Amino acid sequence: AGLKGTLTDSAKSGTFVMDTLSEGDKITIAGKEYKIGSSTTDATNLIDKADKELTAAGAGSTKDVEIDGKKYTLTFKTGGNTIADAEGNAVADLNTLKGKVKEGSSVGYDGKTLTVMNDKLGGGTDGKTADGIDDDDSSIITAARAKDLIKAELTAANNIGTVDEKATVEDGVDADGKTTFEIHKGYATVANTLSFNLHVGADADMTNKINVEIDSMDSASLGIKGLSIMDDSGNAATYAVDAISDAISKVSSQRSSLGAVQNRL
């Protein structure tokens, strides 16, 4: 599914493990890059962090915080740190600085930038229920929304070629800085491999035989039965390309195997 993580496969199940997403992280899902948005509290906590680290650093120290593209410099001062913008205009205190953070604001400190989400509209029946997608920028989403999108992509990727039973993916579980998705594979019933021996020697020696195995080459066996390239996102066509490529490789491998047998006759 083009996701960054580790996929572990077995015959009937699998797991996909990735780093747990946090505010400010970026992730690409189905070819689109998303950024994990934050709450106002998360963003103002970043400013508090700068102030605390400045106080711990002591005399002669400064820390830079950026709010909506504007830089503010915190300078250590016994009895209370001072704050000024890039033009030298003083900011009264830390609470005044934090008051500049609104919905849609970006706050940067120490290489990390958080974007405060504006998420009032959404998928509720009243049209005003938060849906985990920023109302002004659809590329900014919550970590929970990102997990839903990842689950959907893993489900789509694992259902290519399934006919009799569809694959399912459980909700991602966070633990120890990792998020794990459990995958239950689907399947398509296919014909058994045809296997027989050709006797090529002049005597009854059992070594004078060539074993021939022919796999079924129908659409279900090739994993392309019911394959669709139609959806709103274009992802179905993307996964179809891989499925068709795998099918071509399987047919080519079977032809190669039969050609090798023919050359021995």
Question: Where are the language model's segments positioned?
Answer:
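Polar, low-complexity tracts enriched in small residues
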Residues: A1-R264
